[in-house]
């Protein structure tokens, strides 16, 4: 104990030692107090930070309203005390003042600021460029604070612009309400139309089902129609072959009629001569009775006339005339047969189209309109062949009453022959002439009458033969057309047959398509049901929307809500009132550590005052002084922070206790280093201080530090002092504080034990050195 008292006596009696120790008592206060006072609440005085605003905005028009966002911002800033606002129109001068550190921030509002705000509804809207200029090289913190001011300005401008947009939007809500009302009416019409469509869809579904069944029947009937068309084609081909034979017969008739025409012409000529001779004979007959007396003299004359009549009759070539009459009979029979064949042919042509129509009309599964369309389709496939006008041909042919009376002609010819025979006998009967005068006169009369009939018959024969020849010629022309038409009919019927087979294929496709249509119509009917439900709901919702939109009554409070809808609330678990409070754990720990290092400079840590009895007494004679200095340092700095600067803590007495524990732990570390190693130990203590400045986590979170600092973070004593101070000052987590205090006490005990060990070794060494001279 003598050593301890001697140590305090030396301090009190030595001003060179006492005054420095007293000064050391205030080192933590000077370090911590001065620093914390200077930066206790720098953000609370940013209203003194000079910032200049350069407004170059020219304004714009949006939806009929004048936009002056730049001017509005300037007016708002003039009523804002967050910064020391200055306003200018000269950008170049403001930038020069920034370089000269007159301002820490230059805010530039460009000339198109409001104009860009009016492009919000354009295809390519432009953002509002709020430019700012800082000079971080002159003062980084000032530039950083200025950037935070820009964030606030950005929020303010965004709010102002949004309010302008919101006003325009709400002004248009009435138009929107009207449009929604109109849309509701339109949706109602859509709903009504959808109902009609739903009903039509049901009918369509039903009819398509019928169509599906009918198309199968159509396919079967079309196959039958195709077979019938093939049979018609075969019949037409037979008809065409028969027409060829008819044409050959017609040519033969034409040749015979030409021969008959030649014979009838010759007959007419000879009959003229006969009639003239008979007329001469007839003229002489009245005088026959009167000239009986002159008969003898006239016999010669009568014989000559008889010879002349005989020549005329011989010249007639009655054989040819009979042949012509027989040919005429044959022609009449051929003409009758020919007329019958023409009539049959005409009927076959007329029945051609009817055959197709009968097949189609016989279908009981087609409607009248479908039958008409199918008949038109078939008729388009048939070539339009103009059949010859058979009625005209038949009218031009001579009828039976127009031909000469063949029986009469034959009878007259027989009479002529008989009379000629009598005339031939005239020379021989001259002697009997007188007795038969009456008979001769009657015979001549009959001969004349018969000759007239023959003449008239030959005239009719000639006229009839002429008409017959012309009719047959016309018939040949029309028959040629009929033959050509039959050939076209053959071609057309083949095309129709081919078309019907295509129609058969098409009907099968129609059958397949109608089946798909029937299936699709079912889906359509289901979809229309869903659509009907949706259109009804759409109409109702649009009406509700129109009513609700029309009821909107916006005011400034509404505009403000849209412009700034979010209100932030800082519900901190443990709040820190200012910047200085947040830095106190870090700065206070450094002050106490620096105070310990300064003490080792003015207070001798090794030289004993008197003779210590052992190493512990030697250690404690030094440590009790350092412990008292540490406690006083802690009390002074803690009291000034609490009462002088205004530090607020969660527990005052715990704050005092933890400050003392921290100071004693740091002193124990520094004592060991300085005692055992002298100045190199002090240097190591300074190195530890420097490492703790970066690695203890006093400013930025540990996760933001480089990896090396994160590794050594747990080995540094300030790490635990800072965490403990945060717990007692801000968090109120006293359990965590005592945990950190336990770590510091453990470090202090280890350092004290090492120091005691060193002093014990040193004390033994001193004792050994004293004993050696004595011996």
Swiss-Prot record:
It is a multi-pass membrane protein. Keywords: Cell membrane, Membrane, Transmembrane, Transmembrane helix. One of its GO terms (cellular component) is plasma membrane. The keyword Signal does not apply. It comes from the Bacteria. The chain crosses the membrane at residues 16-36, 585-605, 625-645, 655-675, 742-762. Its main location: membrane. It is found in: Cell membrane. The keyword Cell membrane applies. GO terms for molecular function: ABC-type transporter activity. NCBIfam families: pip_yhgE_Cterm, pip_yhgE_Nterm, xxxLxxG_by_4. To L.lactis phage infection protein (PIP). PANTHER family: PHAGE INFECTION PROTEIN (PTHR43077:SF5), TRANSPORT PERMEASE YVFS-RELATED (PTHR43077). This is Uncharacterized protein YhgE. The gene is yhgE.
